[in-house]
């Protein structure tokens, strides 16, 4: 009887290969819009398994509702934050990008007005407002590229907290395990030639080479489609 290889199981999408999104705390979308201003106070700083950036629990003024906010560097418990056109231009506040001065650091930028924030949300990153026109704002992204946004898009003033996270080495495999466990990543990744023959077409044989050509056609059956799929060329390039 045939045996499903890991590539097939990944495509099936079982629990092993799915992100544990039921453990995630919040989507972290902007409140308010370019016409309504919402204010609140930070009551706690928490960790969210969905991301490497700390998140803040905010109690809104008036109604007492609690929401989560993406934390920028320098924010702490007891700080006031606001979303909307009447918000002050200060660290942690969110307002239309057209109202933020040129040269300011911003993060959590909306791709389209009202979508809640899509760009510049990873730990320690920031974008810079470079240019403005009547209805668009030019922003230098963390990649160095220039991107234009609608002047009605909301953005948060400041740099995302958690900078320098990638500089600390994992050191131990157990630390890496817990990091990967919160993502849709299968880890560790075992080489096909190191597997048993039942687990992979390149496995078995008591040797560490494929034992057969690595190239396979585009229409090959799923259990055999491993290696160089529909490759135009293999090996080193000729000079």
Swiss-Prot record:
- One GO process term, biological-process aspect: cytoplasmic translation
Please report a single Pfam family linked to this protein.
Ribosomal_L2_C
SMART domains cross-referenced by the UniProt entry: Ribosomal_L2, Ribosomal_L2_C
InterPro entries xrefs? NA-bd_OB-fold, Rib_uL2_dom2, Ribosomal_uL2, Ribosomal_uL2_arc_euk, Ribosomal_uL2_C, Ribosomal_uL2_dom3, Ribosomal_uL2_RNA-bd_dom, Translation_prot_SH3-like_sf
Q: Which residues form a coiled coil?
A: none
Keyword Electron transport attributed:
no
| Record keywords, A-Z | Ribonucleoprotein, Ribosomal protein, RNA-binding, rRNA-binding
A single GO cellular-component term from the record reads: cytosolic large ribosomal subunit
Q: Specify where the region named Disordered lies, as residue ranges.
A: 1-20, 202-239
SUPFAM superfamilies reported in the protein's UniProt record: Nucleic acid-binding proteins, Translation proteins SH3-like domain
Q: A GO molecular-function term, please?
A: structural constituent of ribosome
Which function does this protein serve? One of the primary rRNA binding proteins. Required for association of the 30S and 50S subunits to form the 70S ribosome, for tRNA binding and peptide bond formation. It has been suggested to have peptidyltransferase activity; this is somewhat controversial. Makes several contacts with the 16S rRNA in the 70S ribosome.
List, alphabetically, the PANTHER family matched: LARGE RIBOSOMAL SUBUNIT PROTEIN UL2 (PTHR13691:SF16), RIBOSOMAL PROTEIN L2 (PTHR13691)
How does this chain assemble? Part of the 50S ribosomal subunit. Forms a bridge to the 30S subunit in the 70S ribosome.
**Homology family:** Belongs to the universal ribosomal protein uL2 family.
Q: What is this protein called?
A: Large ribosomal subunit protein uL2
Q: What's the encoding gene here?
A: rpl2
């Amino acid at each position: 009887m045939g045996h499903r290889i890991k590539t097939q199981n990944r495509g099936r999408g079982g629990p092993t290969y799915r992100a544990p999104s039921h453990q995630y705390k919040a989507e972290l979308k902007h409140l308010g819009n370019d016409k309504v201003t919402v204010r609140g106070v930070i009551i706690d700083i928490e960790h969210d398994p969905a991301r490497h950036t700390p998140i803040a629990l905010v109690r809104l003024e008036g109604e007492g509702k609690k929401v989560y906010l993406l934390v920028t560097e320098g924010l702490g418990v007891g700080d006031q934050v606001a979303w909307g056109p009447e918000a002050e231009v200060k660290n942690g506040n969110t307002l239309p990008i057209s109202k933020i001065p040129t040269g300011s650091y911003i993060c959590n930028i909306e791709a389209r007005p009202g979508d809640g924030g899509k760009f510049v949300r990873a730990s320690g990153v920031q974008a810079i407002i470079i240019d403005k026109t009547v209805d668009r704002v030019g922003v230098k992204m963390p990649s160095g590229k220039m991107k234009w946004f609608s002047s009605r898009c909301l953005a948060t003033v400041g740099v995302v907290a958690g900078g320098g996270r990638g500089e600390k080495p994992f050191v131990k495999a157990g630390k890496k395990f817990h990091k990967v466990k919160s993502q849709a990543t299968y880890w560790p990744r075992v080489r096909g030639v190191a597997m048993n023959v039942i687990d992979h077409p390149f496995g078995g044989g008591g040797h560490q080479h494929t034992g057969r050509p690595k190239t396979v056609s585009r229409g090959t059956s799923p259990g055999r489609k491993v290696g160089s799929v529909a490759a135009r060329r293999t090996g080193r390039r000729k000079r």
